[in-house]
Amino acid sequence: MSFSGHRSWAQHPLCFCILVLACVVVGQQEATGASPSPPPETSSSSWSLVPGKVKEWMEPLVTRPRERWPWFWGLEAFQGFVQTYFEDHLKDLVSRTQAWLHSSKDSLLSKAHNLCPQLLCEKGDQD
């Protein structure tokens, strides 16, 4: 999957969110009997058609792979995927976040100090 202008690190969370969304949709379909959705009712606003259109576009994306890859939708496969995703991308998230916050704080303090007038922020012993 290639998005122009986006960094590759942003693609992993997007793919993960799409996968979780697909699993939620499958779970809801199984709970409701997996019947196809009725056509959306007409309303005065065209914005009211958006949820129906999104569902209409998403259903084939979910049902086709579900029918072709039944092994993928099993709980074990999904748990394995989540565990691998965690180990590959989120395991050191705490240390990376702390390092980023520390560097951001230092950078912000440096910028604030550079913007501060010399009379207010000057270091030294002046009486």
Swiss-Prot record:
The superkingdom of the source organism is Eukaryota
What protein is this chain from?
Answer: Apolipoprotein C-IV
**Record-level GO cellular component terms:** high-density lipoprotein particle; very-low-density lipoprotein particle
Can the keyword Ribonucleoprotein be found in this entry's annotation?
no
Signal sequence bounds: 1-27
| The entry's keywords | Lipid transport, Secreted, Signal, Transport
**The keyword Magnesium appears for this protein:** no
**Biological role:** May participate in lipoprotein metabolism.
Give the protein family: Belongs to the apolipoprotein C4 family.
Q: Which GO terms describe its biological process?
A: lipid storage; lipid transport; positive regulation of triglyceride storage; triglyceride homeostasis
Task: Give the subcellular location.
Answer: Secreted
Chief localisation class: secreted
